[in-house]
Swiss-Prot record:
Domain notes: The J domain is necessary and sufficient to stimulate DnaK ATPase activity. Zinc center 1 plays an important role in the autonomous, DnaK-independent chaperone activity of DnaJ. Zinc center 2 is essential for interaction with DnaK and for DnaJ activity.
Gene coding for it: dnaJ
Membrane-spanning intervals of the chain: none
Name of protein: Chaperone protein DnaJ
Residues given in the record as Zn(2+) 1 binding sites: C154, C157, C211, C214
CXXCXGXG motif repeat start and end residues: 154-161, 171-178, 197-204, 211-218
Cofactor(s) demanded: Zn(2+)
Length: 379
């Protein structure tokens, strides 16, 4: 049974004070934080440090660990409110055959289940920020400076919550245990139980003179700027996670994350569906009838496209690789050119005569008067 491993993870001995443990935790947490240490295995080390601190920062868990090792810290031995009931896993524990008794005792004694350690490090809250992107920025990617407000450790008290020149003191009511004894009258007689201290709320520390900047919270709102590298090919609604850019943690816990949500502006020229881009190209009916080589705009620049004779409205042509980059994959999508044949509205006399000659050669009778017919009155 190894009951020194947690101390070794933090680099302290078994007689270390809580201040020494907390200081060592901050040092080791920073050393192995995934954002700061990219070496293989650093993230696992970081998790081990978190696990060790969660136990050693809690005096009850620490005592159980010192006596029984990791099994004791996890509730495998002793620690229950009545003779170490949590150790009797053979009876199904709290959810086994005696689950009803726990409910009864809980109603009498104000607890019975496992309590959250208020001194354990907790990760800060996650935040969300929306970035507006131009159509081309979403296609090719871009770097953006994002400025937002987040909770950071108070610069005046360094997160302690105490006024400058002072520090949190041991709670006068619970003596630093975070728990107080309460005597209650129950149907089983007068019983003494433990509950969370109502002065320090389980922290064991009492702030008598609060910091004038954060008013005892240990945090303050600060304008924060971060550079966001937007990958090529993003679309509206997609998110990007920036680890550690959220609110500050509690009790030395890590910062939360920032989730950036993208909003892409529509283009007045193109339409997009994933990696595919669509362009509706107006075309003169003469070009469509005789065929032509035309210049087509794409997000990558203009390209030449051969239009075969007899092309009809709605015909589409694929420009391979001229679409948006594939966000999950390699290469680009395609661009589709959709033909929309335009009929001229105002023609000069020569153009009219040419069309009339074409109609005659085609055996088509056209009045060419331009006057409205009978049914046109009802349109």
């Amino acid at each position: 049974m190894n009951n020194t491993e947690y101390y070794e993870r933090l680099g302290v001995d078994k007689n270390a004070s809580q201040d020494e443990i907390k200081k060592a935790y901050r040092k080791m947490s920073k050393k192995y934080h995934p954002d700061l240490n990219k070496e293989e295995g650093a993230e696992d080390k970081y998790k081990e440090v978190q696990e060790a601190y969660e136990t050693l920062s809690d005096e009850q868990k620490r005592a159980a660990y010192d006596q029984y090792g990791e099994a004791g810290a996890n509730g495998g031995f002793g620690g229950g409110g009545f003779g170490g009931a949590s150790g009797f896993s053979g009876f199904g524990g709290a959810s086994g055959g005696f689950g009803g008794f726990e409910d009864i005792f809980s109603s009498f004694f104000g607890g019975g289940g496992a309590q959250v350690n208020p001194n354990a490090p907790r990760q800060g809250d996650d935040l969300q920020y929306r970035i507006n992107l131009k159509f081309e920025e979403a296609i090719f990617g871009v770097e953006k400076q994002v400025k937002y407000n987040r909770e950071e450790l108070c610069h005046t008290c360094d997160g302690s919550g105490a006024k400058a020149g002072t520090h949190p003191e041991t709670c006068h009511k619970c003596g630093g245990r975070g728990q107080i004894n309460v005597v209650r009258d129950t149907p089983l007689g007068r019983m003494q139980t433990q509950t969370t201290c109502d002065v320090c709320h389980g922290t064991g520390k009492e702030i008598k003179e609060k910091c004038t900047t954060c008013h005892g919270s240990g945090h303050e709102k600060v304008a924060h700027t971060v550079k966001v590298t937007v990958p090529a090919g993003v679309e509206t609604g997609q998110k990007m996670r920036l680890q550690g850019q959220g609110d500050a943690g509690v009790n030395g816990g890590p910062y939360g994350d920032l989730y950036v949500v993208f909003q892409v502006e529509a283009s007045d020229k193109f339409e997009r569906d994933g990696a595919e881009i669509y362009y509706k190209m107006p075309m003169d009916f003469v070009q469509a009838a005789l065929g032509d080589e035309v210049e087509v705009p794409t997000v990558h620049g203009n390209v030449k496209l051969k239009i075969p004779a007899g092309t009809q409205t709605g015909a589409n042509f694929r420009l391979k690789g001229k679409g948006a980059p594939k966000l999950r994959g390699s290469g680009n999508g395609d661009q589709y050119v959709i033909i929309n044949i335009v009929t001229p509205k105002n023609m000069n006399q020569a153009q009219k005569e040419a069309l009339q000659a074409f109609a005659k050669a085609s055996g088509i009778e056209v009045s060419g008067s331009g006057k409205k017919g009978f049914f046109d009155k009802f349109k």
